[in-house]
Amino acid sequence: MMSRLRHPYVMSTVGVFFVLLITLLVVDRPVKSEREVQKRVALGKKPTLKHHVPVWLWRGLCVNVGLAGVLVALAPLASRRVTRSGLDGPEHRLKVGEWLMVATAAGVFALSAAPRLSHSLWGDEENLMQTCIADQVTLNADGSVSIAPTAWIETLWNYDRPTNHMGYTVVARLFHEALYSPGSGATDAFFSETAVRLPVLLSGLGWFWAMAWCCMVWGWARGVAPVALALAGHAWMVRYGVDARGYGFVVLLVFLLVGLLGRALQTGAWRWWLGYGLAQFYLLWVHPGAIHAPVMLNLTAVVMVFSDSDKSARLALAGRWMVANLCTAMLVIGVMAPILTPFIAFLKRRALAGSLDLDWFQDAASYLLVGAPWFSWGAGNRFSTSLRDGALLSREWMLVFLVLLSALAGVGIWRVVRERRTVALPLFLIGGPALMILHAVVGETRPYQWYLLPFFPALCLLWVIALAGFKRRALWSAGAFLVAGVHLSAWNQSKLLQEAPIESIRESVALTRKITNPRHPDYNKGVMTAASVMNPGCYDPGAWRFKSVDELRVLMNKADGSRVPLFVNFGFRGLYETMPDVLRLLDDPQLFERVAVLPGQFVSTTREVVRYRGTARH
């Protein structure tokens, strides 16, 4: 009995339980914050993070004390020894030449993605920078600005919009504070795009290593090199391997999760199970919307664990799987509890309401396979490329490539289900995206195609599995086709992403003011800028905000009185159609002169700049 109590698992979980229990007993319940939250909710106002966060951290702590008790209760199961591997299949190695090809692929990706590091941030990136990383700028009544650092509580828990991919944002802010030095010159950058994109670029490089390691774990090493070379040309690499969002981290973490699960099932070792649990938490911390991937991967794990013929191995692995997921749950609850209510509020707003039609599925398949859409999304926009109408080769060739790339993935599925040790993997490889799509259908939402990014690793793995089963000559013939198909299909889209920003916010602001740096002593003098929805954000924090045509007219009168030029900088004309009076005013050539239309690389990222004619002579 005493020896069981001294078991490392028992001692560690009992220790965790008592640490959490003592913390709960010592830390005061945030009663004042609870009252303040209740008061603001009763008034129909949003609670401040200062009061909201302590309330939910305390509630999360209460739940975690109970979950820690469950960890202790699992001791009879979790402390069992693993007498043999639960999953057959030793780790395979890549040859030196194959590693060189993987390294070459990573280098090609880095060269193609590097030009995007310094591009202007686009809408979601800019919103993340403005709310969670860059210094906060307050526009005073006299037009001057006050600047203060962003509080870390905003970085960690500001979830008014799900643009805050928290696990990424923390890393991005640390990079930004380490690499960026503020200046006071007229056009010195107020923040650094490169600094916040660099960790994503590094994670993109990590995709290649993580895919290779994952495939070695599962015994698919032979197919890695050609898929790595194809991956280097995928337009989603150029986009999401650089974008200042958490999607680059998501892809890396999904590759790691599949590899960690493989090692955990093969060895039963605690380090792999705990690593699996930690990686799951980090994936959800980066992007809660990626939950479909770990859900289906865990279902895969359950099937694999309970299909083992050895009862002792089944019980031992089941215990470790439960502990790993309990650790994930405790970390999610302990760290992310404060975002629960804003996340639910966002879902209730139904920002992506709609339905999935054939066009959506065709675009989704095209994006997933090569990173470019099948249909053109913007008539007259030079950035609106598509495989059907604007690809490097003809529409017929593009269709052939897509069909054959899909067929190669189908071969991968066929090979997976033929092997007893991997027969459950399609639950994740196919079931993951199927669950996300089912969720969208039931919820009557029309998600962006990039919401499929958590399953992009599944496609890559299916290609690897398919190639790994070919003999040498067939492997390299099929591999060469894969590389050519992806690179040729994605060429135009990748080239456009390298050449120009997705949204030219920085460039639009430069058209309106000579002094663009809020830290300059003469900032906001001799000029007025105005913006409403889809505003320039932290590129132009001195812009006066308006919500109605009356407020815009007040700014026009103010510009007349002060005899300074007034510019209006706005994006996504479709959204302004919900403010028809404002749009009619801005489109009146007697009142406003069109300065520029800056095309964007997405339906909502074209920007327009107009100048009020009443002050044009000044």
Predicted regions and their residues:
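Short, solvent-exposed mixed-charge patches
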Residues: 616-618
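Membrane-proximal helix-loop-helix interfaces that form the catalytic/acceptor-binding platform
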Residues: 6-17, 21-81, 109-477, 483-614
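Charged, often flexible domain-edge or linker segments that flank or initiate folded functional domains
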Residues: 80-88
